[in-house]
Each structure stands twice: as structure tokens, then as C-alpha cells.
Amino acid sequence: MPRWTREQIRSARMAPLPPLLSQRGLQTIALPAGNLELTGYKGLIVKDSYWRWPNQNKAGNTIDFFVQVLGLSFHQAMRQIIGSS
């Protein structure tokens, strides 16, 4: 498995979620204040590189989303977010 640098991990944590969700075919509904609700995940709110899902008592950054919501491993998440370069 690849070793990720601190900078790559920091960059992945701060990667904007909306374009990554679109790439995966996930749809969102616009809400006030720049928030988006992820369709199919009732109550899951996304804004920039942060998300919160009060119904599930979960929240986090972009990496956390890929691991906790989509069920990927850390390495799979990193590959999805920044690629395998």
C-alpha cells in the first residue's frame, strides 16, 4: 500500500466534497448558506470539505466522508480523493 505524505493527507482532508460527490454520481440538493443535502442520505449536510449527519451523530472532513459514509478504507479514500500519484 502506498505511504501518503502529511501534505497529501492534509490536502485530501480539505478537498471540496461537492465535485467529488458529482464524480461518483451522487446528487445533492441546494440548501441555504451554501449547504448541500446529499440525496439518498436523509439529513446528511455537506459544505466545502466538511459534512455533518446529525441523524447518525457523525461529522467530519472529506477523508472521513469517504470512510464513514461510503465505507471505503483510508487508502481507497485517498486514491479516490487525490489519485494514486
Model-derived regions, located:
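N-terminal structured subdomain of primase-like DNA metabolism proteins
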Residues: 1-85
